[in-house]
Amino acid sequence: MRALVTGAAGFIGSTLVDRLLADGHSVVGLDNFATGRATNLEHLADNSAHVFVEADIVTADLHAILEQHRPEVVFHLAAQIDVRRSVADPQFDAAVNVIGTVRLAEAARQTGVRKIVHTSSGGSIYGTPPEYPTPETAPTDPASPYAAGKVAGEIYLNTFRHLYGLDCSHIAPANVYGPRQDPHGEAGVVAIFAQALLSGKPTRVFGDGTNTRDYVFVDDVVDAFVRVSADVGGGLRFNIGTGKETSDRQLHSAVAAAVGGPDDPEFHPPRLGDLKRSCLDIGLAERVLGWRPQIELADGVRRTVEYFRHKHTD
C-alpha cells in the first residue's frame, strides 16, 4: 500500500508512519511543522520507502501533491489541536480543521484515493454525554469550536463518500499518550507530568483531582488506524480508548511512581470548559475491526517516562 499521512511529524502521525513502514508500506509524510517536530522523523532520512513533503493543508496545492505521489489511502491527522486556541480564534480553527479537511477530500477524490482515514476526537465531540462509557450512538454535543470542527469534518467526509464514492472512516481517540508527546502547553498531561517530575519542577492538577479521562497508548491508537484502512467500516466513527476512567489524581500517582518522584501535585482552580468525565465505549471497534487495546496504563506510563528520561539525560 502507498499511504499519505498528514500531520506526519506529530506525536501520533510519526508513530503511524513508523508502523506503516514496519508493515512494508511506502509512506508520504506531510506536515507544516506548526506543532510537529522534524526530530520525530529524522531517523527515516535514509529510508527509501519514506518521502516527506513540507506543506500546509490550508494553503498547499494538495491536488498536485496527491497527483504526484498517488496514495491509495490518506491518513488525515493534521489539525489545529489546541482547544483553548479554538475558543479564542474559532475562525483559524475552522480554517485548518474544516476547510483543510475539505481541501484534502477534494484533492483525494480527484486523484483516485481509495479511502481517507480521518482523525476525530472521542474525548471532546460528545460533550457531557448521557452515559459512560460513551458509545458512538451518543449524540455529538461539541463544547468547543475544536470539537465542532471535528464533527464537521466527519460530516463533510461522509458527504463526499455518498456523493463521490470516496471511502472514509473516522478514528475518535480518547486521551492519547506515549513517547514523542509534546510536554509543553496544556494538553498531553502524561508527558507534562513526566517532564516536570523528571526535571524536579512542580506539577499542577486543575480542580480537585477527580476529573476522569480515558487514557489510551499511542501504539494501540496507531493499530486502529492501520486496521480501518482496509475495506471495512465505511462512513463509521470508531471510538478508540480503553473503556476505563482514570482520575487526574490517579494519573499523577502513576506517573510519579514510574519516575520515582514526589506524588504531591499543586491543586489549581478548574479551567473553563474542562469536562468532568470522559470514557469511551470501544465495542464497535472490537466487533468490526477486531481491535482491542493491548497496553495497560502502568506499562504505557512506564514507557512514556523512559522516553522522557532518555531525552532528559541526552
UniProtKB/Swiss-Prot annotation:
Cofactor(s) named in the record: NAD(+)
A Pfam family per the record: Epimerase
Gene Ontology MF terms in the entry: UDP-glucose 4-epimerase activity
Isomerase in keyword set: yes
Sites where the protein binds NAD(+): 11-12, 31-36, 56-57, 77-81, 146, 150
Keywords, comma-separated and alphabetical: Carbohydrate metabolism, Galactose metabolism, Isomerase, NAD
Binding residue positions for substrate: S121, Y146, N175, V189, V190, R204, V205, F206, R213, R271, L272, G273, D274
Gene3D superfamilies: NAD(P)-binding Rossmann-like Domain (3.40.50.720), UDP-galactose 4-epimerase, domain 1 (3.90.25.10)
Pathway recorded for this protein: Carbohydrate metabolism; galactose metabolism
Catalytic reaction list: UDP-alpha-D-glucose = UDP-alpha-D-galactose
Family matches, as PROSITE patterns: ADH_SHORT
InterPro entries per the UniProt record, alphabetical: Epimerase_deHydtase (IPR001509), NAD(P)-bd_dom_sf (IPR036291)
Enzyme Commission code(s) on record: 5.1.3.2
GO (cellular component) term, any one: plasma membrane
Protein family according to the UniProt entry: Belongs to the NAD(P)-dependent epimerase/dehydratase family.
Quaternary organization: Homodimer.
Protein name: UDP-glucose 4-epimerase
Taxonomic lineage: Bacteria, Bacillati, Actinomycetota, Actinomycetes, Mycobacteriales
